[in-house]
Amino acid sequence: MTKKILLAVSGSIAAYKAADLSHQLTKLGYHVNVLMTNAAKQFIPPLTLQVLSKNPVYSNVMKEDDPQVINHIALAKQADLFLLAPASANTLAHLAHGFADNIVTSVALALPLEVPKFFAPAMNTKMYENPITQSNIALLKKFGYKEIQPKSSVLACGDVGSGALADLDTIIQKIEEQL
């Protein structure tokens, strides 16, 4: 049976890497459903992820094409794994504190407890190291989320430090170890 991965993409310059990630996961035989925040759509168009995942992209929690299906509940029920990559500081904060104000956070809150949940942060070093962000990460870990650590690299702003999205090979390895 094909394993179903929910790939949640939040607003980070690293969102463009979700295209390659969804493509690689699909090539490995996973069924990938992509969820996007509005901020993520500013960095990469949903159509790109739809073509590469070969599935519709969900970006509006209030859009229900089929009145018989409540998307955020249905997606959560069928997931074998949830991956937030890239995970912005904003989306991590929303998840840690139970906000369900977009498709990503609504699906995440509706996930069955036994579904493995991963997040791969991608943000400026100062944002990543901020005590508020670290507190949110600790809270998510307490709730059962697993962090795929960011790497140290030259960031979009030119700074060098921790906060770059983990290599896709690392992310995929963590997923395959879990599934």
UniProtKB/Swiss-Prot annotation:
Source species, domain of life: Bacteria
InterPro entries named in the record: CoaC_strep (IPR011847), Flavin_trans-like (IPR036551), Flavoprotein (IPR003382)
Note describing how the cofactor binds: Binds 1 FMN per subunit.
Binding sites annotated in the UniProt record for substrate: N124
Catalytic activity: N-[(R)-4-phosphopantothenoyl]-L-cysteine + H(+) = (R)-4'-phosphopantetheine + CO2
Xref: Pfam families: Flavoprotein
Record's signal peptide: none
Cofactor names: FMN
UniProt GO cellular component terms: phosphopantothenoylcysteine decarboxylase complex
Gene Ontology molecular function, alphabetical: FMN binding; phosphopantothenoylcysteine decarboxylase activity
Entry keyword Signal: no
Residue positions of the active site: C157 (proton donor)
Similarity comment: Belongs to the HFCD (homooligomeric flavin containing Cys decarboxylase) superfamily.
Protein name from the UniProt record: Probable phosphopantothenoylcysteine decarboxylase
